[in-house]
C-alpha cells in the first residue's frame, strides 16, 4: 500500500525525471512548471491529495483529485 507521503514523493520524483521544476508553496502545495504549463497539487497535510489544477499559459484547464491523472499531466 502506498502512503500519501510516498505518493507525494513519487510525484516529485516523476516530475524531476521528466524535467519539471518543483516548488513547495506553504508546505501544502507542490507547484510544477515546465514551459508555459503549470500543475498545482494541494495536499491535506501529508495524508492525502486534496486536488490538483492544470494551467496552460496561465489559463485554467482542468481539475482532478486523482494522482494518476496528475501523473498523466506530468508525462505530457
PLM segments and residue spans:
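Negatively charged, low-complexity tracts enriched in Asp/Glu with abundant Ser/Thr
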Residues: 1-29, 59-68
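Amphipathic, interaction-prone secondary-structure segments
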Residues: 18-47
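Catalytic cores of nucleic-acid endonucleases
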Residues: 71-73
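Intrinsically disordered, low-complexity regulatory segments enriched in Ser/Thr/Pro
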Residues: 39-65
